[in-house]
Amino acid sequence: MRYLTAGESHGPRLTAIIEGIPAGLPLTAEDINGDLKRRQGGYGRGGRMKIESDQVVFTSGVRHGKTTGAPITMDVVNKDHQKWLDIMSAEDIEDRLKSKRKITHPRPGHADLVGGIKYRFDDLRNSLERSSARETTMRVAVGAVAKRLLAELDMEIANHVVVFGGKEIDVPENLTVAEIKQRAAQSEVSIVNQEREQEIKDYIDQIKRDGDTIGGVVETVVGGVPVGLGSYVQWDRKLDARLAQAVVSINAFKGVEFGLGFEAGYRKGSQVMDEILWSKEDGYTRRTNNLGGFEGGMTNGQPIVVRGVMKPIPTLYKPLMSVDIETHEPYKATVERSDPTALPAAGMVMEAVVATVLAQEILEKFSSDNLEELKEAVAKYRDYTKNY
């Protein structure tokens, strides 16, 4: 399974093409649109989300509510494009129109300046448009397809925010994936401890009044994962490594950890390793899950627990200093629409990319042309691992 995304933030539409989804997977636009709506939601989102109401359109690969095995093409229209027809025109236009909304003051922390240098742009809008987090719309759409596949294989996935700008959220112990999903969905800030809800919302309001932004940490948890996905035989086949790459590819994500993560560096080995248990009913399990579901780059049957750290959104309403690329004079950075935080939305994107990598790994291990073949292969493998 592989995919590509295309489109600009203020272009006419966003597109994704997925190849390798087996035939026969039940799939409708509603399966995608629910996740797209959650990506646009969350406390603290800005004006762009009031303009767009993302709805996916299938243009290939799905017929009568099921995948056909052909490449799946999905489009999402950018409604805001109508205000940018000249600025984002694919055809050459008059110079006086080209100068409208031209960007020569790069924003610190964005791709603006480095993209301009790399691709030799005199208008940094070209960097801004493609590097925008608007692209994650299609990664969420791709992830929704992947999640539909994982659900057919009895795997479930959820995300929630565990740190808001330095404020850690206490997470009740032993929550199931379903409970995490339910609690986070009921929270405007995607947390599972509702006693902290108003405190976090008040904090976001204060950050907005200050013209500033905050980052944080989001966690994705996956249950029902088969043992042995990934491999130790080559560095690039380790599944936790593939997941780490996918997570830090998300806009503004700067770090990733599994299970205890960096805390493991402060503990003794006896306080980190997960003791192995066996029972006739469950087969092999672990007493704890400090390693986040991975040993040797492979899934060990425990829930996958992965966290990603998101830096504060770099577009500030009180902009930092920058330099004009035409005059080299100091200027305040360009201000585009921004949010005080996008952590709840980022959690949806992280959930999507994790689901996508897991679907890719499943289809690599259990190559199948149609869904029934895949389900039979996975069920047979689960029986084998349980009775090993």
Curated annotation (Swiss-Prot):
Keywords: Amino-acid biosynthesis, Aromatic amino acid biosynthesis, FAD, Flavoprotein, FMN, Lyase, NADP. Its cofactor is FMNH2. GO terms for molecular function: chorismate synthase activity; FMN binding. GO terms for biological process: amino acid biosynthetic process; aromatic amino acid family biosynthetic process; chorismate biosynthetic process. One of its GO terms (cellular component) is cytosol. It catalyses: 5-O-(1-carboxyvinyl)-3-phosphoshikimate = chorismate + phosphate. FMN binds at residues 130-132, 251-252, 296, 311-315, 337. CDD domains: Chorismate_synthase. Reduced FMN (FMNH(2)). Its EC number is 4.2.3.5. Pfam families: Chorismate_synt (PF01264). Homotetramer. This reaction introduces a second double bond into the aromatic ring system. Belongs to the chorismate synthase family. This is Chorismate synthase. It comes from Streptococcus pneumoniae (strain ATCC 700669 / Spain 23F-1).
